[in-house]
Amino acid sequence: MNESITRRDILRTLAFGAAAGSVLQVIPAEAAEYVHQMVHKEKAAAPAGKYAPKYFSAPQYAALLFLCDTIIPKDEKSGGAVEAGAPEFIDLLTSENPEYQLKLGGGFFWLDAACTDRYGNVFMECTPEQKKEIMDLIAFRKNAKQDASLSQGVAFFAFLRNLTTDGFYTSKIGIADLQYMGNTALHEFPGCPPLPE
């Protein structure tokens, strides 16, 4: 990686590319790997090796952890989004991008307000059933067409789901989950299979 490029340059490039589309489609793997390395360095430098959020408040970060874990949970095959560092990846990108700050900060504000209106509690203080109910409402775009008051929540969740997926599948855990071995050379090209007669 070019040493003259700063951390801020990389994060801005990543955030801009992700805003235009999926990180996996737009952002070079080297740049996404750089963000994961920065997260690792932040954790290593922190007391007890715990990542300190750069942008999100403690309640927002707790909600981010919960949502990322719900979007890609840990299973018997591999760790989930939280173990892969997706929340930290998202926080680090958001700390450098005003558009992300507006979309995600506004989304968490909307989520707490919607839960307060429906259940009398902010999202993280809701029961598991209430959390599932509100997430089911914002997980599908069709719900925003049926109820316009959900449109901001649906847009927020779609954006967060994409970032979580990008953060997961650009991490070591996500790449291992895909069983991606990299570009490998064929020792011999077997040719096309014969056509059925």
Residue ranges and their predicted role:
Residues 3-4, 25-66:
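C-terminal segment of N-terminal export signals and the immediately downstream linker at the start
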Residues 1-18:
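N-terminal secretory signal peptides and thylakoid transit peptides that target proteins
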